[in-house]
């Protein structure tokens, strides 16, 4: 199997849903920094797609959202300039403007995060994320904003439990797992173009390390177990979040968790 294979899971006239393996970057990195830590050319998502799927030449591809190098899972790639602009508008302005895009992740934690509501909304400066604890070590997260390392920072600073194998934010190494893979996966994407809305579940990429890391919650094909799939499809916070916990750390006004 090609180490940097980027399978197209779903096709729509305005976009593709692809499954990113760990190690691939969604935008070209600074090469001087890259070669300090790597002895190979940076595997850039769109470059790999063009090489692996040459029959789609002539389309204008854009990644309208990005995943960090060690994060796996679904990425929506627009197929034309208008779609890219409409998805970007939705991400910037929210609501029903542009083409609305829903992004849900699952995160593996080393231990249970105690003392927090089972579900709620995290506001940390300008970073907003909805969450629900599915198991002691498994959290579902839906981005309301998309800042750099948003989920990784919030798991470490709010939950007090970094994502598994995420040493950048204080996570412990996992024996037998490569360094550039963490327990954070883009597992659900919802996209609405005009009146047409579609949702997609994204399996764990078929690599030995990823399957080992997520073994507890996936089947032999990499799909999540039914209980996790149901939560990914159905997740929604209550319309009124009447209670608030304020944490003193985090700066920029601190951290708030709103919950019912």
From Swiss-Prot:
rRNA processing as UniProt keyword: yes
Where it sits in the cell: the answer is: Mitochondrion
EC annotation?
5.4.99.43
Chief subcellular location equals mitochondrion
Q: Which Pfam families match?
A: PseudoU_synth_2 (PF00849)
Please name the top-level EC class of this enzyme.
isomerase
List the catalytic activities from the record: uridine(2819) in 21S rRNA = pseudouridine(2819) in 21S rRNA
Recorded GO CC terms? mitochondrion
What Gene3D superfamilies is this protein classified in? Pseudouridine synthase (3.30.2350.10)
Keyword annotations: Isomerase, Mitochondrion, rRNA processing
Q: Where are the transmembrane segments?
A: none
Which terms does the UniProt entry file under GO BP? enzyme-directed rRNA pseudouridine synthesis
- What GO MF terms are annotated? 21S rRNA pseudouridine(2819) synthase activity; pseudouridine synthase activity; pseudouridylate synthase activity; RNA binding
Q: Does the keyword Hydrolase apply?
A: no
Q: What does this protein do?
A: Pseudouridylate synthase responsible for the pseudouridine-2819 formation in mitochondrial 21S rRNA. May modulate the efficiency or the fidelity of the mitochondrial translation machinery.
The family line of this record is: Belongs to the pseudouridine synthase RluA family.
Question: What is the name listed in the Swiss-Prot or TrEMBL entry for this protein?
Answer: 21S rRNA pseudouridine(2819) synthase
């Amino acid at each position: 199997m090609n180490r940097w294979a980027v399978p197209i899971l779903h096709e729509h006239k305005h976009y593709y849903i692809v499954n990113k393996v760990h190690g691939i970057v969604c935008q070209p990195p600074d090469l001087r920094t890259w070669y300090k830590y790597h002895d190979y050319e940076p595997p850039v998502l769109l470059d790999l797609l063009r090489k692996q799927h040459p029959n789609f030449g002539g389309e204008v591809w854009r990644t309208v959202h990005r995943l960090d190098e060690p994060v796996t899972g679904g990425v929506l790639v627009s197929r034309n300039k208008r779609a890219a602009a409409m998805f970007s508008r939705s991400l910037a302005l929210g609501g029903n403007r542009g083409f609305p895009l829903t992004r849900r992740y699952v995160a593996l934690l080393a231990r249970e995060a105690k003392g927090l509501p089972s579900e709620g909304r995290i506001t940390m400066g300008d970073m907003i994320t909805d969450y629900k604890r599915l198991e002691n070590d498994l959290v579902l997260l839906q981005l309301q904003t998309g800042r750099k390392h948003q989920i990784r920072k919030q798991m470490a600073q709010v939950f007090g439990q970094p994502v598994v194998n995420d040493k950048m934010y204080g996570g412990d190494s996992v024996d037998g797992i490569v360094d550039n893979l963490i327990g954070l996966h883009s597992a659900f994407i919802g996209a609405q173009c005009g009146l047409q809305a579609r949702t997609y579940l994204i399996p764990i990429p078929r690599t030995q390390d990823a399957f080992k890391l997520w073994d507890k919650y996936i089947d032999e094909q990499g799909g999540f177990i039914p209980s996790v799939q149901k939560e990914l499809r159905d997740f929604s916070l209550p319309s009124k979040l009447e209670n608030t916990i304020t944490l003193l750390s985090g700066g920029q006004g601190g951290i708030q968790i709103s919950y019912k």
